[in-house]
Regions:
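Active-site-proximal specificity loops/subdomain of glycosyltransferases
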Residues: 1-5, 14
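Conserved catalytic core of nucleotide-sugar-dependent glycosyltransferases
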Residues: 10-112
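Charged phosphate-binding loop/patch that engages nucleotide di/tri-phosphates or the phosphate backbone
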Residues: 111-120
Length: 120
């Protein structure tokens, strides 16, 4: 069986999941899905993709823990164009409140956090 370690705002690609199920699954997992990253709403696509959902087995997840897999996601093999991630939705005010709640200094942080984005 396939186990997906993912945030609720990360949507894996059905095509990539079907592909993984069609091959010798145990030979390729864990694998990270590189996803298109949107900020604030679906009009703002970040130019860099997000390595989000991790596809694995229960055995690997028990051996390494979801937290350890997440911390290793940039060192695990990945599939590109594998879904969508939606970060900081709810409008600019909601995002500002989120940053303030986390005590993140927002001055100058917006540019660094959002990086290069395109308005679709």
């Amino acid at each position: 069986d396939i186990l997906i370690v993912s945030d609720v705002d990360e949507i894996p690609s059905k095509k990539k999941l079907e592909f993984i199920k069609s091959c010798d699954f145990n030979e390729i997992v864990p694998i990270v899905f590189e996803q298109h990253l949107f900020h604030i709403d679906c009009n703002f696509l970040r130019l860099e993709s997000w390595r989000g959902s991790i596809v694995t087995t229960m055995e690997i997840c028990k051996a390494y823990s979801p937290h350890r897999l997440r911390r290793s996601r940039n060192r695990i093999s990945h599939f590109s164009d594998s879904g969508w991630a939606f970060s900081s939705f709810g409008g600019a005010e909601a995002v500002k409140k989120k940053f303030e709640a986390c005590k993140i200094e927002t001055k100058g942080y917006w540019r660094d956090y959002f990086g290069p984005i395109i308005n679709k």
